């Protein structure tokens, strides 16, 4: 069993869904009312807490997760910026709150009880900062800045959680590309960046120390593959746990594109695309790599797909209403869920 948490800010709810892996069935377990518009969510590495960014009264709410995945609010922490994206370090000791509108990353300590403490650092002047991503060595945070057409790199102090510019500090993408979200290969030194404005995935190769970085491929998610569009509004990107398939979503075309990650070069080979929910703001691949769930911000529905292991293709399993404007999806995978 797995639990999906889906935030729907337009009706100020979090929907808690249970997935039965064997029966391929989604069941609504709980609907939680939020004090404001719930947007970014992230599960603590110990899987005992869910953190939810709230607007317009800027704060992060902390929920305790029960043994069966249900939520109980235990804390509300005021912050000084509008939360866009939340990331937690692997040790569960610091949360990094990205604000697109305030152009910053807010570093907040997490205590041993899972509660948020005061902000310890704010990195400012990051124009259109849209996500915070930590690669497999856990030492560097990557922050795509959409309005700068850059990806900023920061060294993480694992004791204090603070950030300082890495060397090199910046990866430049094409003008008017708009780097937004990222996914990392889990065993090799490759990163995949979805650009919001031009619908291009940048494939970045780097060495162990992340001192030599190169964009080795730029591949369009749609326009060169049978769908003639000049406008993009690309949103999200994820890789299956076995590093074989990569998916990305576009909100203008309402599509999910599928790529194969080539074994030898780690470059991308386009396979196909499908039409999905209206305005797919967020999607997620489950921990088994067998399922993909997408949230339609304008359709107000979610769709559960099966991922076919042999070719990566998606087939619809079920579709469900999930509030108004569903945006963010987080997953809980615990052996104790029943």
From Swiss-Prot:
Q: Does the keyword Nucleotide-binding apply?
A: no
Pfam families reported in the protein's UniProt record: Lactonase (PF10282)
Please state the Enzyme Commission number of this protein.
Answer: 3.1.1.31
One GO MF term attached to the UniProt entry: 6-phosphogluconolactonase activity
- N-terminal signal peptide: none
Which GO cellular component terms, listed alphabetically, does the Swiss-Prot or TrEMBL entry include? cytosol
Pathway, according to UniProt?
A: Carbohydrate degradation; pentose phosphate pathway; D-ribulose 5-phosphate from D-glucose 6-phosphate (oxidative stage): step 2/3
Q: Which Gene3D superfamilies match?
A: YVTN repeat-like/Quinoprotein amine dehydrogenase
Whether Glycosyltransferase counts among this entry's keywords is no
Q: Which reaction does it catalyse?
A: 6-phospho-D-glucono-1,5-lactone + H2O = 6-phospho-D-gluconate + H(+)
Q: What class of enzyme is it?
A: hydrolase
Query: Keywords for this entry?
Result: Carbohydrate metabolism, Glucose metabolism, Hydrolase
GO terms in the biological process aspect are:
glucose metabolic process; pentose-phosphate shunt, oxidative branch
Q: Which PANTHER family did the record assign?
A: 6-PHOSPHOGLUCONOLACTONASE (PTHR30344:SF1), 6-PHOSPHOGLUCONOLACTONASE-RELATED (PTHR30344)
Tell me the protein family, please. Belongs to the cycloisomerase 2 family.
What is the recorded function of this protein according to its Swiss-Prot or TrEMBL entry? Catalyzes the hydrolysis of 6-phosphogluconolactone to 6-phosphogluconate.
What protein am I looking at?
6-phosphogluconolactonase
Q: Which gene encodes it?
A: pgl
